């Protein structure tokens, strides 16, 4: 990854239980139904603490993002793809609003209300 120095980096995050008495092996971004923008912001730099990330340009230029890990194996992954499109090609997909669309999806189709944070752009935390 260091050799490739990607233009954009997207990490996943979740609500993985942590033991406060143990050091996390991999610090992650807190995301999901129980998270909020403040918590996502506080933990967003966690993955960047891994050795080598300081050598990459993407995090330094605002091209570092996080998405809810559990999108990987369910039909909601269409919302993750919407976020990826917006983050990778912001001009072409400026009219995409994954958080707004996921909220609307919950209102129309889910038996419970939307809560939490599922997409995080440290450069635009209010859009999370």
Protein language model features and the residues they cover:
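Binding-cleft/active-site segments that stabilize strongly anionic ligands or cofactors
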Residues: 1-76, 82, 99-104, 109-127
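Short, hydrophobic alpha-helical segments
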Residues: 85-92
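Periplasmic-binding protein-like
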Residues: 93-98
């Amino acid at each position: 990854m260091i050799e490739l120095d990607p233009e954009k980096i997207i990490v996943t995050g979740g609500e993985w239980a942590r033991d406060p008495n143990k050091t996390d092996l991999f610090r992650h971004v807190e995301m999901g139904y129980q998270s909020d923008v403040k918590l996502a912001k506080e933990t967003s730099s966690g993955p960047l603490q891994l050795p080598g990330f300081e050598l990459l340009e993407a995090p330094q230029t605002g091209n570092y993002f996080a998405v809810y890990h559990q999108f990987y194996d369910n039909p909601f992954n269409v919302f993750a793809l919407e976020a990826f499109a917006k983050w990778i090609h912001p001009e072409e997909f400026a009219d995409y609003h994954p958080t707004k669309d996921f909220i609307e999806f919950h209102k129309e189709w889910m038996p419970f209300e939307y809560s939490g944070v599922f997409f995080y752009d440290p450069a635009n935390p209010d859009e999370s």
